[in-house]
Amino acid sequence: MKTKLVLLGTGTPNACPNANGPSSAVVVGDRAYIVDFGPGVVRQASAAYFNGIDALRPDLLTVAFCTHLHTDHTAGYPDLIFTPWVLERPVPLKVFGPKGMQHMTDHILKAYETDIDFRINGFEKANESGYRVEVTEIES
């Protein structure tokens, strides 16, 4: 089974027009594991998919790891939760991260509850599981 490391973003906390926020993907066979989710993570995964890395098709993004809770490493988290769901991810996102990851996740889901309700019950019905997140906090 072949393993690849794909750099999805190598930016810093500074707004740089030529670099997306910190994010990588470890691709093992046909599975992708996202590591950190800086701004642009889903767009960059989509670009990698269109350049031949099938495992980075956005609706297949189902497992992610967060190294730490700095904003430059997490600002793309709502995008990682919701965009693949809108694109019909059928299962919850599994996220492994430090203490505080569950708290952050709960607040993101709360902030977007109106959108979630609209997408589940509105005109273009989305599935009821793809926006959910299963968090495992890892003690450091």
Task: Please state what every model-predicted region is.
Residues 1-140:
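Binuclear metal-dependent hydrolase catalytic cores
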